[in-house]
Amino acid sequence: MIAFILMFIISCFLGPDGFTSFLYIFLSSYVGHVVLHDDLFYYLPYSILHRYHHEIHSPFSYFINILSELSQLTLALFLLPLNPWSMLYGALMFVTIHYINYSWLHINTYHEKHHENVTSNMSPDIIDVVFGTKHPDTPFFEDTTHMIPNVILCALFVFWLKQYYTPSWKRYFCYISSILILLLSTTAFIIKNKT
């Protein structure tokens, strides 16, 4: 729980709308994950890539899923007036915790329980508690102390980047994001046709 509190405190220093933007990404990561597992959205490119992540555990599937998750945030930045620093901070938090802590280091069984039952442990943990999607074999509140290095290092990186940001980056960010989304859509199409 301490890591979540620390995340929200840090988000307050990312700008006047930092907290609300981080709250948005916190809630949307849960809702987005639920949507990715819903049959109604089975053929969306992001759902195809996410299913691939569940079925095949390889460096390629991790890489594609990381790109997919980061590109989803670029769509939100184009459509909603959110704080880009909070969005970047939230994205880095999600990706580093999901892939480094859970998938590579296997800090606990929280994420593995989600792979056993895709309707449980959608994450973040506190949201699973609120919506009743906690896996019955996981503690009511996850010990989040393993997230503290991620929280601190991601915050330092975002604050450093914010200090050296120039407005011309936005144009390049849009170009790169567009190419990334095109790449992911093409990859999803290829994976769908192979399965």
Regions found by a protein language model. Name each.
Residues 14-21, 78-88, 161-169:
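Transmembrane helix interruption/hinge and helix-loop junction motifs
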Residues 43, 101-142:
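Membrane-proximal soluble regions of multi-pass membrane proteins
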Residues 71-84, 122:
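Membrane-interfacial alpha-helical segments at the cytosolic side of multi-pass membrane proteins
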